[in-house]
UniProtKB/Swiss-Prot annotation:
Coiled coil: 31-64, 91-142, 188-266, 350-377
Modification Phosphoserine occurs at: S308, S318, S344, S407
GO MF annotation list: identical protein binding
Designated name of the protein: Cerebellar degeneration-related protein 2-like
Length: 465
């Protein structure tokens, strides 16, 4: 029986040896091309990962530079705070000096008012004294005239008295009497002169007080100018402090973005390895097993139709995963790009942060190009898988080995059922959400939440100020 079975197998092998050899050569060529393309793609992915690592290192250096700048800004902020304290103390001293000068100015004004009142009162007293002196002079002249008139009368009435009056002694006595009468009003003139000198002294004091008042007003204007300058410097210090707070918030946001990006790169690397593992293992599954004796060709011929559906399923799984990578959460990725663009427009003043933002956008573009290349490569691999599976499924040799002769309608029905099975597996894989997609959604949700919290804190600080 064994010999008969061996003879039948040998006859079948002689009849269809060139078919199996041609199919195996075609499969080997396709597997070699597939392995070559996969190796080239692996090298390209490694080069892109090296570029990403170098970009990541550059961004780490930039973040270190930004931290150093932040430290310097903090030192400058501390120095500004010290200067602000000194300015505050100087402003307080100037306010006290200003108040003291205002009090002195008020006291000087009151003193000037009192001195003007005293001068007016003294002037009125001088005028009254001058009027009294004029009255006394008038009365004295009237009295002298009356005495002369009476003397003349007595002289005319008594001729003996006329001789006495005309004598030298009488004239000397009359002169002495007149001089005594003239010396009488001299104290009033001295008082008048004293009052006039006092008025001159008071006027000089008033002029000095006016000069002091003008000097105090000039000092007051200088103090006001210094106070306005200090207020302006204080406003500039507040602006610097707010700018430092904004830079700290931006640095914190950049650090969060760096952490998220490194996490995404690590996840992408593991995901690329996981996706490329079944593709690199595919040629090993298609190779014939050496050392299987005379039954190796027959076993390969029988197992090839069974292996082709699983191979197609494996390739469709990888294609579905690549499509899921490219189409992962487009809404959240678009929202993240819009948020980054808005942040870059809002912070157009800082060149360093704008360069970091541009580099991050360039990195995102490289990442999308890499995903598109992976998708194209996956499409090429799927096309190659279809080319390798269709000749095997269309070949009638394995149908003859399995069950004799079959009609062309039954072959088409088997091929249709196989394609329906592959499509069902693809749909089931597309419906099941992969793990990395949920992880990316969670990462972008966390980033948007932190941005919302930072914006809320900024709004609270601005409202409190």
């Amino acid at each position: 029986m064994r010999r008969a079975a061996g003879m039948e197998d040998y006859s079948a092998e002689e009849e269809e040896s060139w078919y199996d050899h041609q199919d195996l050569e075609q499969d080997l060529h396709l597997a070699a091309e597939l392995g070559k393309t996969l190796l080239e793609r692996n090298k390209e992915l490694e080069e892109s990962l090296q570029q990403m690592y170098s970009t990541n290192e550059e961004q780490v250096h930039e973040i270190e530079y930004l931290t150093k700048q932040l430290d310097t800004l903090r030192l400058v902020n501390e120095q500004h705070a010290k200067v602000y304290e000194q300015l505050d103390l100087t402003a307080r001293d100037l306010e006290l000096t200003n108040q003291r000068l205002v009090m002195e100015s008020k006291a000087a004004q009151q003193k000037i008012h009192g001195l003007t009142e005293t001068i007016e009162r003294l002037q009125s007293q001088v005028e009254e004294l001058q009027a009294q002196v004029e009255q006394l002079r008038g009365l004295e002249q009237l009295r002298i005239r009356r005495e002369k008139r009476e003397r003349r009368r007595t002289i005319h009435t008594f001729p003996c008295l006329k001789e006495l009056c005309t004598s030298s002694r009488c004239e000397d006595a009359f002169r002495l009497h007149s001089s005594s009468l003239e010396l009488g009003p001299r104290p009033l003139e001295q008082e008048n002169e004293r009052l006039q000198t006092l008025v001159g002294v008071l006027r000089s004091q008033v002029s000095q007080e006016r000069q002091r008042k003008e000097r105090a007003e000039r000092e007051y204007t200088v103090v006001l100018q210094e106070y306005t300058e200090l207020e302006r410097q204080l406003c500039e210090m507040e602006g610097c402090r707010l700018r430092v707070q904004e830079l700290e918030a931006e640095l914190l946001e950049l650090q969060q973005m760096k952490q998220a990006k490194t996490y995404l790169l690590a996840r992408e690397e593991h995901l690329a390895e996981a996706l490329l593992a079944p593709l690199t293992q595919a040629p090993e599954a298609d190779d014939p097993q050496p050392g299987s004796g005379d039954d190796s060709n027959a076993q390969d011929g029988v197992s090839s139709p069974a292996a082709s559906p699983s191979h197609a399923v494996r390739k469709s799984c990888s294609d579905t995963a690549l499509n899921a990578i490219v189409a992962k959460d487009p809404a959240s990725r678009h929202a993240g790009n819009l948020t980054l663009h808005a942040n870059s427009v809002r912070r157009r003043g800082m060149s360093i942060l704008r360069e970091v933002d541009e580099q991050y956008h360039a990195l995102l573009e490289k990442y999308e190009e890499l995903l598109s290349k992976c998708r194209q490569h996956g499409a090429g691999v799927r096309h190659a898988g279809v080319q390798t599976s269709r000749p095997i499924s269309r070949d009638s040799s394995w149908r003859d080995l399995l069950g004799g002769e079959e009609s062309p309608g039954e072959g088409k029905a088997g091929e249709k059922s196989l394609s329906q099975h592959v499509e069902a597996v693809d749909k089931r894989l597309e419906q099941s959400q992969p793990e990395y997609k949920a992880l990316f959604k969670e990462i972008f949700a966390r980033i948007q939440k932190t941005k919302a919290d930072i914006n809320a804190t900024k709004v609270k600080t601005h409202s409190s100020k």
